[in-house]
Every structure is written in C-alpha cells, then in structure tokens.
Amino acid sequence: MNADLKRVRENTLDDSPSPSAKRRLNSNASSPIQPSDDEGMAEWMKIVEVKRKEAIYRQMLEYRRISEHETKRANDLEAQRRVLEASFHAVELCWTQIVAAVRDLAGAENLQLKEEEVLEPLLDPSTPVPELEKALRSRLPTTRQLVTRFVDLVAHNATRPASEADLQARCLKLEAEASALRSNSKLLESEISALKGSRDEAQRDLQRIRKALDRERMEHGKAQEEWKEERTRGGQATPNLRANGSGHSTPNGKVEADKKFYSGAGPSMAGVLQDTSELEQLAASRLKQLEQLRFEQTQLQQEVDRLKILANHPSEAALRESPFFQVYLHQLSTSINRAESLQTRFTATESKLDQLRDSNGEFREAVLAEARGQTETLRAQMAKKDSDIARLRGQRDELNSEIMERRAKEVEKCKYTEQIENLANSRQERISFLTSEVRRLKGKLAAAHSSDGYLSFLKESGIDGDYVKDLEAKVVTSQDQINALTSQLERVSSDTAAAKSETEVRTELESAKRLLARYERILGPNPEAAEDVRYLSQQLEKKEKERASLEMKLEEAEAATNALYSEVEGLSKLWEALDQTVKSKVLELRDGEQKITRLATEKAKADNKYFAAMRAKEAVDMEAKAAQRSVEKQLRLLERAQEVETSLRSQITANEKGLTALKNNALDLQNQLATVVAEKTQLELRLQQSQNALVEAQQIMHQRVAEAIAEKEARAKLQDEADGQMKIIKKLKERQDAVAAASQTGMSDHEWAITQERDKLLKLLKCSCCEQNFKQQVIVKCMHTFCKQCLEQRIASRQRKCPACGLAFAKEDIQTLYWQ
C-alpha cells in the first residue's frame, strides 16, 4: 500500500507545496484561503487536488475489495448450483422408485402405461423455470391415470378398510408434524433474515472502518515523508560533521546528524511530537476497534459458512419440507394406504369365502373376540414397556446428572491445579528476587569495607560460595607453589642453606622493588625529597586509596541499580498477573451469581409444571378408575359368553392355524424385503449427500486457512512498519528531552552546542560495539577501529568478522591504534 501511495503522490503536480507549507496551511487561522492572496489560493488548490487523488485511491481500494467479495460470492453460487443439480438427480431417482413400486403393487398390464414416458428424465437443472413447469404438467396426466386406477380398484370393493380409525389417527399425527415443521421453518426463516441484517450491518461497519484505516495510513505515510524531508533539510544545514574514528563512511563510529533544536527549532519539534502522540492514541483506539470488528467478522463468517453448508446440503427435515418431496410423499402415502386397504379387503373377502364354504356363521365373532384378546395383551405389554422406558429414562437422567457433576469437579480440580502452578511460579520468581537482593546487600557490605576481593568473588561465584574457603584454597595453592619452587631451587643448588638464603634475598629484593616503584611513582626518580614532597606523597597515597574505594562503591552501586531494575520489572509482571487473576475471579463470581439466579428461576418454573402435571395426573387417574369399573362389568358378561363358545373356537382354531401362520409368514417376509430395499436406497442417498457436504466443508476450510495465512503475513508487515516508526519517535523524544533539560538548566545556545559537540566527539572516540570502552585497535583490512575487549571476544568466539562491514579478518590483521 505504501508503494501505491507513493505512486499517487508522485503523479501530483510538480509544483506542489512543501510539507512545511502544508503544515502552515493546516495549522493557521480558521480561514485557510485568503481571497487577496493568489499564491495562497494556488497552494490551497494544490492541496485540494492531492486530497482528491487520495480519496480516489481509497475508493479504488474499496472497489477492489468489493470485486473480490463478488468473485467469492459467484464461486459460492456455482457450488450451490452443482449441489442443486445433484438434488434434481436424487428427485429423478425417487420418482423412478415410486413408479416401480406402484407398478409392482397394481400391475403394469392393468395400468396400461407407457414405461418410457413415465420414466423419461424431464427434470433437467440446466433448463429454465418455465420449461420445468412444462415438464411437470406433462407428467400430470400419467399421475392422474395412476390415481384413477387406484380409485377404480377401491370402487370395485364395497367394504371400507378395517383400519379407518388408524388411518385417521395417522393423518392427524402427520398434520401435527407438518404444522410443527412449518412453524420451525418460519422460525428458521426469521433467524436467517435477522442474521442477514446483522451481517449487512457488520459489512457496512467493516467497509467504513477500512476506509478510515486507509485514510489514516495515507496520513501516517504523508507525515513520515514530511518528517524525513525536514530531517534531510536539517542534515544539509549542518555540513561541518566530522568523520568517524576509522576515517571511512561506514557503520563503524557512525554519528547521526542531530538537528539543532535551539534558535527557534524547539517549538516546531514539540508540535510534531504532540501530533505524533495524538496519532498514537488515535491508532491505539482504532486498533481496538479493528480487533473487535475482526472478532465479530470471524464469528459472522463462521455462521455464514454454517448456513451456506446447510443451504447447499440441507438436512432431512428441510428436504421433507420441500414442495416436490411433499407432493411425492403425499402420492406415495396415498398409494400405500390404498394398497394396505386393498390387502385388508382381500383378507376379509377370503375369510368370508371360508365362512360361506364351511357354513360357519359365527366365525367372524370368534375372530373378533380373539383379536380383542390379543389387543388387550398387546396393550398390557405396551404399558409394561412404557413403564420400563420411564424407569430407564429416569436412570439415564440420574447418570447424566452424575456425569455432569463429575465433569464439573474435574474442571474445578484443573483450575485449582493451574492456580497452584501459577502460585509456585510466582514464589519461584520471588525467591530469585530475594537472591538478587542478598547479592546486592553483600556487594554493598563489601564496598563499604573496601573489599575488592570479596566483590570479585561475588561476581564469579554468586552468593552460594564460601569466601573464607576460597581464600584458604588460594593460600594452600600459593603455599604449594612456594614449596615446589623451593624444592626446585634445592635440587638445582647443592647447598641447601645457600639456596634458602638466596630465596630469602630474592624475596626481599622483589618486595623492595615494588616499594621503590610505588615511591618513584609518587615522588619521582629523585631520592632526595623535601619534607613538603613527603607530605604531598602521603596525601596522594591517601587520596589514591579513597579513589579506589569510591570506584569500588560506584561499581557496586551500578550493579545494585541493575539488579533493582530487574527486580522492579519482575514485580511489575507479577502485579499484572495478579491483576488479571483478580479480574478473572470477579468475572467468575458474576457468572456464578447469574447462574444461581437462572437456576432458581428454572426451579420455580419446574415446580409449577410439576404441580400442574400432578393435578392432571389425578384427574386422569379418576377417569381411568371409572373406565376400569365399566370394563370389568363388560368383561364378566363376555366371559360367560366365551365359556359357551370355547368348544367351537378350539375346533376352528385347529383347522385354520396352519394356513394363517403360513400366510402371515409370507406377508412378513414381503414387508421386510420392501423395507430393506427402501432403507438401502435411502442410505445411499444420505451417503452421497454427506460426501458432497464433506467436500464443500473441506473447500471452505482450505479457503479460510489461506485467508488466515495472508492476513498473518500482512499483519507481520504492518508490525515491522510500526516498530520502525516507534524507533524514530523514540529518538525524537530523546532529543526533545535533551532540549528541555538544556532550557531548564539555563544553558545558552552556544554552551548547549558545545556540549552536544563534546558528546559527539566522545562518541567518536568510544567503541561502536559496546559504547563503553575507547577505541584501542584497528583492523588493517577495512581500517575500522574498536576496543580491545570486543575484538578479543570475537576472536575467542570464532566470529572473526568486522562488526561494521562484515569483512572477515584474522588475528594478524589487528594492530594497535595510537592517538597523537
């Protein structure tokens, strides 16, 4: 985007106003256009032209985003079209199966239908809607012929089906299910419309925020270019800059050309920093809004994907609500009901023929009585099964509640374990802080007693070592070395006494040399020193000790300060973690209170429902008792009649038992075969639909993963740009602090300039790697200069490349640098 913005600005007018002129125009009085000033009008028109081009560029970005969205939408519609084509083929298959089933039940020779016309695939998804309606109208006569044939078959039979009450009950049940499905459909349609409205509103908000973000990016890029131009002009205004320590314009010894904030430059830089701070606050607020909107967009996108998958691969309930399925289902149910009624009539007719053949007029009554007995038995079994189901449901509910309770306990245990781990980590950090404090206090104590050896021991071994044992070990080592040297001298010299005396003489000579060197360093080479010189030497020696003590205290204070900084940083992190923990606990407490309130409300509702159910149950029990008494009276009468007819029933049952069993077995096998075939076809269709839904879900997943990767890369780029801008702003703030400090101390412009020049020269003399030691050695290959410690560290670590230019060097390429 920055490259595009730069191209837009380069295409503006050649004589466009400078950034400083634009700032003056923007920060002047309320009337930026002066009618009497033609030059001001021209500059204003140029600024207006630049703003217009930037607005055109932002609108082009918006058009590009809209084009990408429409392309994606077109791809989704194409995928939906393919799914609908598959649905059309499924409907064709369903129609073929219905025609085959009807033909098998009624007989193809009696129907007098042309199978080619009936099974011709007229539903082509590529044809327009009028042609589809024409195809349906062409099939309408065939359907009417089938219905007419079934009506004729019903008309030939004078008796009505015996299961008319069952059919009516089933019809009422299906109507109730249809009304429930219609209400659910309307509810889902209202939810979809609400989601569409919220999605449109979120898209409008996202479009508005994207425009604002583009505008802010362009303003930020413009401000950055203006600042760079001002910095370039400031660098050109100070040409008297010295070269670096190596004599080359390389990163080694680099000194930045600081702007002179004195003599009227301070207020402008203060204004720039103020504008920068305001822009930072605005960017932070916009970033929060963008994160919130991105989260909402992600949720809406997930919801859209879910709805899209449901639209492309609807569920069985949605398919059952479709008009084509309802038409075919109605036709199929009508055909099946008629076939069942015909089968029942056929059975009744056969029984009547048997009765007429056997001259048994009471056969029907016996059959009805037996059917009633079986019905009562089945009712008792159904009641028993209902009680068993209720008992199993109660056990299931108890087990589910127990499982939920155990899961809640496990979640609480996990939370408690996590809190214990966090507490242990904080205690560990506290121990490290206390260890640092002990080290700092020991260093302070050593500095107070001027113990340089103890300070070095603390730096090397820390607080766990024993200083006395370390000194004893050093004494033992020194004594061993002395003994070894003494024994060596004894072996070299034949006379032990002479060797011992020579050793003592050499020891005294070395001590005298050290003492003489110290006196010569203080008094000079002249051995004849006056009393004032001796006094001066004593004072110098005393001051030298004080200086060494002060340096030791200063070093210890710096180490203590660094340790305090690290402790403060760690404590701040612990405080932030504790604050987050407190906030999470407050939120958990609020959620718990809300949950308790909701459970109390639900309990009250459940109690009301329970009492209402108990009252209804009592009323039903009373009605059941009254019905039971009437049934018992009727049963007594039936038992008396059954005792008379028992002998006749036994004979009839013995004769017809075998034939009835065979017929029932044949019918059961036919029904099972038809059921298995229908289930197989239905499972195949479900498998195909599930596979299509899986493929589309995988495509959506890959698309979302690609979008997430692209967004991550763009975010990383923007983060790098923001880090660079933060470094520049930090440098500007440091310079402003330096100017403010100089103005508070009452330093004049000339003195401040001299101080800045002194700091620059001191920076030139110091090593560019560590910025602490002075430059002592030079690399002869590239002539870059560094301190001795930095080069020795690189040689020891085998990183033998110049820190400034990266040129490889050897140990022989390093020479000592002499300042003259």
UniProtKB/Swiss-Prot annotation:
One GO CC annotation: HULC complex
Residue ranges that the Swiss-Prot or TrEMBL entry lists as coiled coil: 68-92, 164-226, 287-738
Residue numbers spanned by region Disordered: 1-38, 213-254
Molecular function GO terms recorded: ubiquitin protein ligase activity; zinc ion binding
Residue stretches of biased makeup (Polar residues): 235-252
InterPro entries: E3_ubiquit_lig_Bre1, Znf_C3HC4_RING-type, Znf_RING, Znf_RING/FYVE/PHD, Znf_RING_CS
Pathway, per record: Protein modification; protein ubiquitination
Keywords of this entry: Chromatin regulator, Coiled coil, Metal-binding, Nucleus, Transferase, Ubl conjugation pathway, Zinc, Zinc-finger
Gene3D superfamilies (alphabetical): 1.10.287.1490, Zinc/RING finger domain, C3HC4 (zinc finger)
Xref: SUPFAM superfamilies: RING/U-box
Family according to the record: Belongs to the BRE1 family.
Protein name per the record: E3 ubiquitin-protein ligase BRE1
Lineage: Eukaryota, Fungi, Dikarya, Basidiomycota, Agaricomycotina
UniProt gene name: BRE1
